[in-house]
Design a protein with these regions (language model features):
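RNA-interacting cores
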Residues: 1-199
Length: 199
């Protein structure tokens, strides 16, 4: 199966702030589309999960936290306006100047949460079938089960490592992702260097 996807790129912004709520992805997407309405109409756009540390009062941001938006190259000029902007995701954040980062192929990639069934066997079988439909041969390792919850909205799934990828298949998955809810950080892959770190 061949699918047409646009060439993608990562727009990277340093983020200043102390913490974010556990359900911050919903408010973050709302803020981003408020500031850059062009983002709202393209389902291929994804927002990578922020690197955080859990605490009793929310999720703490490290000093070098970064917001990464994966989007078609054609839309990259629109997000330049995010530089220096404040964001309200339940706690205040501010973005520094952004830069563009090329997406490179890696044989092993990882997604923090891929949306799907809440049963691991069903989840793995569904993703294996999806990869087969794409003509991709690779190995899967399902990790931790987790959920995103915001009121009545609930997104379930597992973290996922895909390894033994050919370069062209890696780029396809890095560009297109797997599953739904990319705007909330789901199904977006990044390089993963040590498989044992999953456990």
């Amino acid at each position: 199966m061949t699918i047409a996807i646009p060439e993608m790129i990562d727009a990277v912004f340093d983020v200043s702030g102390d913490r974010v709520p556990v359900n911050y992805p919903f408010a973050l997407w709302k803020e981003l589309t408020r500031l850059v309405p062009e983002l709202a109409g393209d389902a291929s756009i994804g927002v990578l999960p922020l690197r955080t540390t859990g605490s009793a009062t929310g999720m703490l941001l490290p000093k070098r936290a970064k917001l990464v938006i994966r989007l078609p190259v054609s839309l990259a000029p629109h997000v330049a306006s995010l530089s220096g902007q404040p964001l309200d995701v339940g706690h205040p954040l501010r973005l520094a100047n952004g830069r563009l980062r090329e997406i490179l192929a890696y044989s092993t990639i990882h997604a923090q949460l891929v949306a799907g069934a809440d049963d691991e066997v069903v989840f793995a079988e569904s993703l294996s079938a999806c990869l087969a439909d794409l003509g991709i041969t690779a190995s899967l390792i399902c990790g931790r089960k987790s959920s995103l919850v915001d009121g009545d909205r609930r997104i379930h799934g597992f973290s996922l490592v895909i390894h033994d990828l050919k370069p062209e298949d890696s780029l396809l998955l890095l560009y297109a992702g797997l599953g739904s809810h990319r705007k909330y950080g789901c199904g977006i892959f990044v390089p993963y260097k040590v498989i044992s770190d999953l456990y």
